[in-house]
Amino acid sequence: MAKLVFIRHGQSEWNLSNQFTGWVDVNLSEEGVRQAQNAGALLKKEGILFDQAYTSVLTRAIKTLHYALEGSDQLWIPETKSWRLNERHYGALQGQNKAEAAEKWGDEQVHIWRRSYDTLPPLLDASDEGSAANDRRYAHLDPKAIPGGENLKVTLERVIPFWEDEIAPKLIDGQNIIVAAHGNSLRALTKYIENISDEDIMDVEMATGEPVVYDLDENLNVVSKKKLN
């Protein structure tokens, strides 16, 4: 039996200012740091010993992982960063205040962009200075792999190959894994491992800085799930 822990990054500066973040690399807020440190204390109390850690290439998730591992006295364990664990790319909405976007396009349209499983947001052009194509952390990628915007369906298609190739084999081998990532990349993984429908996943929320602990059998079926708070 292997343990799998998901942690959505602690509150970010743009969570605090109510902005669409996506692939923009913003930092944790002071509250976000506190949440990540608290996650570490909860994991230490739970007594979970990890073999491997995974996170995205975005600062808010990386720092959350480090605070959580430091708090549970496991900062030394092997760590892998992957762009495939990044947040959903919000396209041209990135950087915009959510309330102002609702005023511009209407509450219903913005709600559809945020919550529909397969509706894309307005796309960010590759020539835009804010495009990830201009960020050297993605220089190794085929430019065609860099999205201009994603829905949850596309995010799932991005995340699952990494799960299948990197994370699942270690869990099958009995290793305990921690994944510190983002609301939508973790919702995508949650949908996959819990076999949640396209409709029901839209109601699943990932709280910032809250560890979610799974016990998985040798076939990666969920035996138990609990949230630490």
Curated annotation (Swiss-Prot):
It catalyses: (2R)-2-phosphoglycerate = (2R)-3-phosphoglycerate. It holds the Pfam family His_Phos_1. The record marks 182 as: Transition state stabilizer. Pathway: Carbohydrate degradation; glycolysis; pyruvate from D-glyceraldehyde 3-phosphate: step 3/5. It is an enzyme of class 5 (isomerase). Substrate binds at residues 8-15, 21-22, 60, 87-90, 98, 114-115, 183-184. The active site is at residues 9, 87. GO terms for molecular function: phosphoglycerate mutase activity. InterPro entries: His_Pase_superF_clade-1 (IPR013078), His_PPase_superfam (IPR029033), Phosphogly_mut1 (IPR005952). Transmembrane segments: none annotated. Keywords: Gluconeogenesis, Glycolysis, Isomerase. Catalyzes the interconversion of 2-phosphoglycerate and 3-phosphoglycerate. Belongs to the phosphoglycerate mutase family. BPG-dependent PGAM subfamily. PANTHER family: PHOSPHOGLYCERATE MUTASE. This is 2,3-bisphosphoglycerate-dependent phosphoglycerate mutase 2. It comes from Latilactobacillus sakei subsp. sakei (strain 23K). The gene is gpmA2.
